[in-house]
C-alpha cells in the first residue's frame, strides 16, 4: 500500500464480512482518501477560491494596522467563504456516510440548498478566526519586542482558540445536515462540546495545530492550503466528531427513512402509470 492508497486496497476479500462494521481511526482515514480523494481535493480547491477574497481583504487591513478594517473585511469575505466551507464539510460528511453519487452533481445541489444557511455562520467563522489570528500575532509581536503581555492574556488567547474551534467542530456539520435556526445550531454545538468533551478537544487541537503550521510556514503555507488545506483538517475533525453527531441527531437513520419514502413514492407513481388504461 502506498502513501495514498487506491480504493482497491480496501475491497472486501477473504475473511471480510459483507456487512462488516466500518473501519475506524487511521484505517478509516486511508479508506476515505483512497476512495473519495478526487472529490475532497476538488472541493478543497473550490474552498480555497472561496477563501481567497477574505484572505486578501483581511491582509489589507493587517497592512493598515487596523483591527476594525480586518474584522469588517472578514465579515464581508465570510459571505463567500461560508458557503464554500459548508460544501467542504458536505463533501467530507457524504464520504463518512459512504454515500454514493457523482461528486459534482451532489456538490451543486448541496451548494444551492446550503447557501443561505451558511452565510451567517460564514461571517461568524471568519470574524472569530480573524480576531484569533490578531490576538496571537499581538501576543507574539509584543514578546518579540521584549514585552510579555502577561499570563492572563496568554491563557485567554489559548482558551479562545480552543473553545471556538470546539464550537465550530460541531457547528459546521449541523449547518449542512440540519435545517434549523443558527441559534439552535449554536446551542446544540455547546451542548455537544460539553457532552463529548474529549472528542471536541481533539478536533479543536487538530484545527489549531494544522492552521498554526500553515500560518507559520507562509508563504509555503499557501501551497499547503492548496494541497492539504481544508480537506485534510476537515476530514480528520469530522471523523472525530461524526459519531457523536449521528448518535445525537440520528443523521443516517433519518436519511435512510427519507430515501425509502422517496423510493416508495416513486414506485407508487410507476405502478399508477402502469395501471392507467391506454386510449
Question: What are these model-predicted stretches?
Answer:
Residues 1-137, 141-143, 150, 167-169, ...:
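Helix-coil boundary and N-terminal low-complexity module in membrane systems
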Residues 152-164:
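Alpha-helical transmembrane segments of multi-pass membrane proteins
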Amino acid at each position: 500500500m502506498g502513501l495514498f492508497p487506491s480504493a482497491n486496497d480496501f475491497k472486501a476479500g477473504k475473511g471480510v464480512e459483507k456487512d462488516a462494521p466500518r473501519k475506524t481511526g487511521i484505517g478509516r482515514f486511508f479508506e476515505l482518501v483512497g476512495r473519495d480523494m478526487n472529490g475532497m481535493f476538488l472541493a478543497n480547491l473550490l474552498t480555497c477560491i472561496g477563501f481567497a477574497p477574505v484572505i486578501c481583504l483581511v491582509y489589507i487591513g493587517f497592512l493598515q494596522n487596523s483591527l476594525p478594517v480586518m474584522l469588517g473585511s472578514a465579515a464581508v469575505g465570510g459571505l463567500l467563504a461560508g458557503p464554500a466551507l459548508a460544501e467542504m464539510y458536505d463533501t467530507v460528511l457524504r464520504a463518512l456516510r459512504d454515500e454514493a453519487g457523482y461528486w459534482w452533481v451532489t456538490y451543486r445541489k448541496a451548494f444551492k440548498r446550503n447557501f443561505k444557511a451558511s452565510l451567517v455562520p460564514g461571517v461568524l467563522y471568519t470574524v472569530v478566526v480573524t480576531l484569533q489570528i490578531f490576538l496571537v500575532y499581538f501576543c507574539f509581536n509584543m514578546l518579540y519586542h521584549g514585552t510579555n503581555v502577561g499570563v492572563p492574556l496568554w491563557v485567554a488567547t489559548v482558551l479562545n482558540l480552543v473553545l471556538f474551534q470546539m464550537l465550530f467542530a460541531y457547528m459546521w456539520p449541523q449547518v449542512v445536515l440540519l435545517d434549523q435556526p443558527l441559534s439552535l445550531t449554536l446551542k446544540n454545538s455547546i451542548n455537544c462540546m460539553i457532552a463529548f468533551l474529549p472528542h471536541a478537544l481533539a478536533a479543536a487541537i487538530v484545527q489549531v495545530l494544522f492552521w498554526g503550521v500553515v500560518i507559520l510556514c507562509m508563504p509555503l503555507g499557501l501551497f499547503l492550503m492548496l494541497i492539504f488545506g481544508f480537506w485534510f483538517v476537515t476530514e480528520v475533525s469530522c471523523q472525530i466528531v461524526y459519531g457523536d453527531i449521528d448518535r445525537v441527531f440520528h443523521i443516517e437513520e433519518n436519511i435512510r427513512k427519507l430515501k425509502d419514502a422517496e423510493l416508495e413514492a416513486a414506485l407508487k407513481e410507476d405502478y399508477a402509470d402502469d395501471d392507467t388504461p391506454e386510449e
